[in-house]
Amino acid sequence: MITMKDIIKEGHPTLRKVAEPVPLPPSEEDKRILQSLLDYVKMSQDPELAAKYGLRPGIGLAAPQINVSKRMIAVHVTDENGTLYSYALFNPKIVSHSVQQCYLTTGEGCLSVDRDVPGYVLRYARITVTGTTLDGEEVTLRLKGLPAIVFQHEIDHLNGIMFYDRINPADPFQVPDGAIPIGR
């Protein structure tokens, strides 16, 4: 079981590496790691379990955040309509995206960052992601809004990118024309 002590913090070199692809079919160890990422995000959203194990709530987690430099992510988030997006993916990849951008009005946070970083993180408003599930199924996901933001945040971790790298240092709250605000 992953707990907060397993999550590495900003400044750790693994968070700046490009993670390695997972050979498919995945090993039992890689399956166990990916399942543990999903278990963490699910458990962290349960107030009772989060309190019991001292888990900081999260809606996504990438393997590099537990010092495993492999291309694996887990996301457990609902959109504005209450639809649940719960996925654990090997080798996720953004295969297409909109020109239009969006941003979280609250800014973004990260389990590997223990400080508030003010500013808007501009993301693609719509993306298509491919990846392989724990069951070995190839999936194609068309995402928008908060789920699209979370997938982009987690896939950034696989490429050594932190969310605050995407904040404009000259004007952290700059909003380009046509960017869609996403509330949380």
From Swiss-Prot:
SUPFAM superfamilies: Peptide deformylase (SSF56420)
Family according to the record: Belongs to the polypeptide deformylase family.
Protein residues bound to Fe cation: C110, H153, H157
One annotated GO molecular function: metal ion binding
Cell cycle listed as a keyword: no
Free-text remark on how the cofactor is bound: Binds 1 Fe(2+) ion.
Cofactor field: Fe(2+)
Organism the protein comes from: Geobacillus stearothermophilus
UniProt keyword terms in alphabetical order: Hydrolase, Iron, Metal-binding, Protein biosynthesis
Classification via InterPro entries: Peptide_deformylase, Peptide_deformylase_sf
Name of the protein: Peptide deformylase 2
Primary enzyme class: hydrolase
Active site residues according to the UniProt entry: E154
Top-level taxonomy: Bacteria, Bacillati, Bacillota, Bacilli, Bacillales
Catalytic activity as recorded in UniProt: N-terminal N-formyl-L-methionyl-[peptide] + H2O = N-terminal L-methionyl-[peptide] + formate
UniProt GO BP: co-translational protein modification; translation
Role of this protein: Removes the formyl group from the N-terminal Met of newly synthesized proteins. Requires at least a dipeptide for an efficient rate of reaction. N-terminal L-methionine is a prerequisite for activity but the enzyme has broad specificity at other positions.
EC number: 3.5.1.88
CDD domains: Pep_deformylase
